């Protein structure tokens, strides 16, 4: 086997290799999951594997929020690119030059008021992916709370891998906050503080977290989780079958009613009256008409 080109730096990873004659003579296929595990293909598997560099860290911060910045127009950036750069500088040079991604696991946010508890002060929080153009689609999480209880806290499990080359990395995952009560505090004062904590990891691959228990990223395992396209569902149906929709009665199933201390009882939605009920009522009406007729006859005789 001969390596034609290998590029591995903080920009990209690329490997091109010519297969040896012993492999060319086999029925090797990259789509067969078991192929790479066979002894005769172990060399190929090792060549196309690469080191998995994964450095975990924790960032935390606390900021004071002036009352004039609580109208929703100001946001808090949760990723500090300068801090990430400092963290990368602590990694040994051989691995440092390969770092390409920052993975965000969990974001925790704690908001604490600077005023007494009990004051009605609703607050709206929106966590956004600010890289997206559509405002609605950029929403990761939306929360509503009230600082009359003194504190608000929420956790968001992000599981995002971001490229360190992103122009907006510092402004990518942001927290918008909006005080819903106006004319609450004089300008120049601070209504609350925001403390945040982020679990993160720096890596050389977008897939590093998936291999966090392993020192290598193996090509066969990397592609084993990719969605496999199956034949269309309608492939076994005739054209008429696939296009036909069978109507079903609206009230096809009985309703189930639960009564306290009683067994489950089934009742249909529309239950037609019994035939004997109809006969009984009809006979009663006939009897009443007959009685009235007789009374009229008796009155005529008296007159």
From Swiss-Prot:
* Keywords tagged on the record: Coiled coil, Host cell junction, Transport, Viral movement protein
Q: Which GO terms describe its cellular component?
A: host cell plasmodesma
Coiled-coil stretches? 272-302
* Pfam families in UniProt: MP
InterPro entries this protein is in?
Caulimoviridae_Movement, Viral_movement
Which compartments is it annotated to reside in? Host cell junction, Host plasmodesma
User: Single Gene Ontology BP term?
Assistant: transport of virus in host, cell to cell
Task: State the similarity comment.
Answer: Belongs to the caulimoviridae movement protein family.
**What is this protein's function per UniProt?**
Transports viral genome to neighboring plant cells directly through plasmosdesmata, without any budding. The movement protein allows efficient cell to cell propagation, by bypassing the host cell wall barrier. Acts by forming tubules structures that increase the size exclusion limit (SEL) of plasmodesmata, thereby allowing viral ribonucleocapsids to spread directly to neighboring cells.
Under the subunit heading, UniProt states:
Homotrimer, through the coiled-coil domain. Interacts with VAP.
Q: Which PANTHER family is this protein grouped with?
A: CELL-TO-CELL MOVEMENT PROTEIN (PTHR47599:SF3)
- Name-wise, this protein is Movement protein
**Gene source species:** Soybean chlorotic mottle virus
């Amino acid at each position: 086997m001969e390596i034609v080109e290998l590029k591995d730096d903080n920009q990209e990873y690329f490997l091109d290799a010519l297969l040896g004659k012993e492999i060319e003579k086999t029925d090797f296929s990259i789509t067969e999951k078991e192929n790479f595990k066979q002894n005769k293909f172990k060399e190929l598997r090792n060549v196309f594997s690469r080191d998995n560099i994964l450095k975990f860290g924790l960032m935390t911060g606390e900021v004071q929020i002036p009352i004039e910045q609580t109208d929703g127009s100001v946001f808090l950036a949760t990723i500090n690119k300068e801090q990430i750069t400092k963290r990368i500088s602590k990694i040994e040079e051989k691995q440092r030059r390969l770092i390409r991604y920052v993975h965000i696991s969990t974001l925790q946010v704690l908001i604490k008021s600077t005023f007494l508890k009990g004051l009605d002060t609703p607050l709206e929080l929106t966590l956004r992916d600010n890289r997206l153009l559509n405002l609605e689609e950029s929403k990761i999480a939306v929360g509503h709370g009230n600082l009359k209880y003194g504190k608000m806290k929420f956790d968001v499990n992000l599981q995002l891998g971001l490229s360190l080359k992103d122009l907006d990395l510092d402004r990518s995952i942001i927290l918008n906050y909006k005080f819903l009560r106006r004319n609450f505090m004089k300008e120049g004062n601070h209504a609350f503080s925001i403390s945040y904590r982020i679990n993160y990891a720096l890596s050389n691959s977008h897939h590093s977290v998936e291999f966090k228990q392993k020192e290598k990223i193996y090509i066969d395992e990397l592609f084993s989780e990719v969605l496999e396209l199956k034949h269309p569902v309608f492939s076994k149906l005739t054209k008429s079958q696939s296009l036909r929709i069978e109507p079903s009665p609206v009230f096809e199933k009985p309703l189930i009613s639960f009564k306290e201390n009683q067994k489950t009882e089934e009742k249909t939605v529309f239950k037609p009256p019994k035939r004997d009920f109809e006969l009984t009522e009809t006979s009663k009406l006939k009897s009443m008409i007959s009685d009235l007729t007789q009374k009229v006859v008796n009155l005529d005789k008296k007159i």
